[in-house]
């Protein structure tokens, strides 16, 4: 029995006990490892960085999915960038009012390995008839597609390796171009305590592009460093200020059962701490 040492940060990190190595492969794009941990269940890492675990993935996937879709209220077409483990797809597919889901993943091996070794993440969602799975670079897709979407979810790795381009100015501009009127973009943005410069960079990308931009957060044990931020860009300022009762009605009407998300958490997630507000040059959470 050995340990897996994450290598994301210099001088600070986390270690996972590997009860059993389930799969290890160097794909065309990255080094993929899936192993069994006694506390977190099955764990996937890419290029030395923990990506997802069976124990707490529900927090991340529910918050990146249900917040924008329920805020929008009438999303028919959803685009997922990344998300090869299938967890984001599983949560989007729970919204029966969504008519079309396009998922763009750069690494086909990640999809196939997660189907085999992390089947609970996708829970059969890869067989959903609404899905169009595209194996391609996410940046290239949003830069060239003629399709439009109501919600775009960027479920990227950290801004290193294949995921680096998904934090570029060109990526945010291309996503904005792909949104229908009234569309929403959300992206994974790391833990601000450890990756504050990344949050600042994203704020600079969003400001000027979107009528309303902000961040929201959730605490996910696997992603060390405190609460994780998700970037929010909307073409309609009202989405972030929806009354609690409206969200309750939409959530109840969806019939979706969650383990983390609820309308109260939805609203509270947009309340950022002072150091993050200061970093992104916002005077308040308004």
Swiss-Prot record:
GO biological process terms on file: spermidine biosynthetic process
Annotated pathway: Amine and polyamine biosynthesis; spermidine biosynthesis; spermidine from putrescine: step 1/1
Subcellular locations according to the entry: Cytoplasm
InterPro entries: PABS, PABS_CS, SAM-dependent_MTases_sf, Spermi_synthase, Spermidine_synt_N, Spermidine_synt_N_sf
Pfam families assigned: Spermine_synt_N (PF17284), Spermine_synth (PF01564)
GO-annotated cellular components: cytosol
Catalytic activity: S-adenosyl 3-(methylsulfanyl)propylamine + putrescine = S-methyl-5'-thioadenosine + spermidine + H(+)
UniProt keyword annotations, A-Z: Cytoplasm, Polyamine biosynthesis, Spermidine biosynthesis, Transferase
Binding locations of spermidine: 61, 85, 155-158
Binding site for S-methyl-5'-thioadenosine: 30, 105, 137-138, 162
UniProt domain PABS: residue ranges: 1-235
Principal subcellular localization: cytoplasm
The enzyme's E.C. designation: 2.5.1.16
Known role: Catalyzes the irreversible transfer of a propylamine group from the amino donor S-adenosylmethioninamine (decarboxy-AdoMet) to putrescine (1,4-diaminobutane) to yield spermidine.
Self-association state and partner proteins as the record states: Homodimer or homotetramer.
Family according to the record: Belongs to the spermidine/spermine synthase family.
Name of the protein this chain belongs to: Polyamine aminopropyltransferase
Native source species: Pseudomonas syringae pv. tomato (strain ATCC BAA-871 / DC3000)
